[in-house]
C-alpha cells in the first residue's frame, strides 16, 4: 500500500510539474496555439522513437553487416572460370557453365542483403580474340540466363535484367532473346541485374562522345551544356538508377579492372578475391562486403 501511495505521489508530482508550465504557456500564447505546438512535439518525438526502434532492422544480425552501409551497386569481374576448370580436370565449357550458375547465386544473395544493382563483366570486347569454340560456348551461356529456373527467379524476386555492350557481333537469335528478357522484366524497380556483353569501358566512353556530337550537330546541346552528369546519361549504364558501382569485386587474384567501367569506377571501392569465380561463395561475398563497410569513402576529399 505504501509503495502504491508512493507511486501515486510521484505521479501527481510529475503531473503538477507538467501542468504548471502548461497553464503559464497557454495564458501567454493561447490554448489553441499551445495545443498545436504540443501535438507537433509529440509527432516529432514519435518519429524519433520510430527511427530508434527501426535501427535494429538495419543490422543483418546473422553476419553483422549493417544494412544502411550496404553498397547500392556491386560490380563483378567474373575471372578464373578457365583456370578453375583446368584445376578440376574439366573442360573450359564446364568452367564457364559453373561461372554462369554462380552469378545467379551471388546476385540472389546480394539482393537478399539489400543491394539494389548487381553488374557483371560477362564477355569483354577483347574476348572475341579467343578461339571460336570458346566464343560459341560463351555465347550459349548467355542463353543460360533465360532458362526456366532463372526466369522464375527473375519474376519471383522481381529482378530487372539489362544487357549492355556493343552487340554488333552478337548473333541475331541471341539478340532477340536478350530483348525478350529485357522487355519481360523492365517493369521491376528495386532489383537490377546488368550483364556487360561485348563490352569495354573505352567503347562505352566513345559511344557516349559520339552520341553527344550527334546531339550537338542537331542543335540539341551546346558546349557549355556538357558536364559529368550529361556524359553519364549517355553511358550504357544509364539504364540503372545507380550507374556507378560503390564496390567492384574481381576474383582469381588478378588486381586490375581490364577495361571495365572505366568512367563508372572512378570512386568505387575495389576488392580483389584470390579465389576463382566458380568458388566465390556466400562467405567470400560477406568478406568483401564487410571490407567495404569498414572503409571510409572520401571521394577525393579530406575528412
UniProtKB/Swiss-Prot annotation:
Expressed in low levels in the whole plant. Preferentially expressed in roots. The keyword ATP-binding does not apply. It is an enzyme of class 2 (transferase). It comes from Arabidopsis thaliana. The gene is DPS. It comes from the Eukaryota. It is a single-pass membrane protein. Pathway: Protein modification; protein glycosylation. Its EC number is 2.5.1.87. It catalyses: n isopentenyl diphosphate + (2E,6E)-farnesyl diphosphate = a di-trans,poly-cis-polyprenyl diphosphate + n diphosphate. The chain crosses the membrane at residues 14-34. One of its GO terms (cellular component) is endoplasmic reticulum membrane. Its cofactor is Mg(2+). Catalyzes cis-prenyl chain elongation to produce the polyprenyl backbone of dolichol, a glycosyl carrier-lipid required for the biosynthesis of several classes of glycoprotein. Coiled coil: none annotated. Belongs to the UPP synthase family. Pfam families: Prenyltransf. PANTHER family: ALKYL TRANSFERASE-RELATED, DEHYDRODOLICHYL DIPHOSPHATE SYNTHASE FAMILY MEMBER. Keywords: Endoplasmic reticulum, Membrane, Transferase, Transmembrane, Transmembrane helix. One of its GO terms (biological process) is protein glycosylation. GO terms for molecular function: ditrans,polycis-polyprenyl diphosphate synthase [(2E,6E)-farnesyl diphosphate specific] activity. It is found in: Endoplasmic reticulum membrane. This is Dehydrodolichyl diphosphate synthase 1.
Amino acid at each position: 500500500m505504501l509503495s502504491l501511495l508512493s507511486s501515486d505521489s510521484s505521479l501527481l508530482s510529475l503531473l503538477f510539474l507538467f501542468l504548471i508550465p502548461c497553464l503559464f504557456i497557454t495564458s501567454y500564447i493561447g490554448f489553441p496555439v499551445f495545443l498545436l505546438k504540443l501535438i507537433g512535439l509529440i509527432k516529432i518525438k514519435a518519429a524519433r522513437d520510430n527511427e530508434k526502434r527501426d535501427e535494429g532492422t538495419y543490422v543483418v544480425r546473422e553476419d553483422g553487416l549493417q544494412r544502411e552501409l550496404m553498397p547500392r551497386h556491386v560490380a563483378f569481374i567474373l575471372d578464373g572460370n578457365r583456370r578453375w576448370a583446368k584445376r578440376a580436370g574439366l573442360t573450359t565449357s564446364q568452367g564457364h557453365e559453373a561461372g554462369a550458375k554462380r552469378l545467379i547465386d551471388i546476385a540472389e544473395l546480394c539482393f537478399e542483403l539489400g543491394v539494389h544493382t548487381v553488374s557483371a563483366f560477362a564477355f569483354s570486347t577483347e574476348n572475341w580474340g579467343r578461339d571460336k569454340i570458346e566464343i560459341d560456348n560463351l555465347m550459349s551461356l548467355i542463353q543460360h540466363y533465360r532458362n526456366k529456373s532463372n526466369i522464375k527467379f527473375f519474376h519471383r524476386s522481381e529482378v530487372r535484367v539489362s544487357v549492355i555492350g556493343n552487340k554488333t557481333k552478337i548473333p541475331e537469335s541471341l539478340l532477340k532473346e536478350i530483348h525478350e528478357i529485357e522487355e519481360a522484366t523492365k517493369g521491376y524497380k528495386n532489383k537490377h541485374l546488368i550483364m556487360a556483353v561485348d563490352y569495354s569501358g573505352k567503347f562505352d566512353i566513345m559511344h557516349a562522345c559520339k552520341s553527344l556530337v550527334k546531339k550537338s550537330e542537331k542543335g540539341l546541346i551546346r558546349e557549355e551544356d556538357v558536364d559529368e552528369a550529361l556524359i553519364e546519361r549517355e553511358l550504357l549504364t544509364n539504364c540503372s538508377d545507380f550507374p556507378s558501382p560503390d564496390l567492384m569485386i574481381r576474383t582469381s587474384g588478378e588486381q586490375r579492372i581490364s577495361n571495365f567501367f572505366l568512367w563508372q569506377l572512378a570512386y568505387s571501392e575495389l576488392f580483389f578475391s584470390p579465389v576463382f569465380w566458380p568458388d566465390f561463395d556466400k562467405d567470400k561475398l560477406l568478406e568483401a562486403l564487410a571490407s567495404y563497410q569498414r572503409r571510409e569513402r572520401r571521394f577525393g576529399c579530406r575528412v
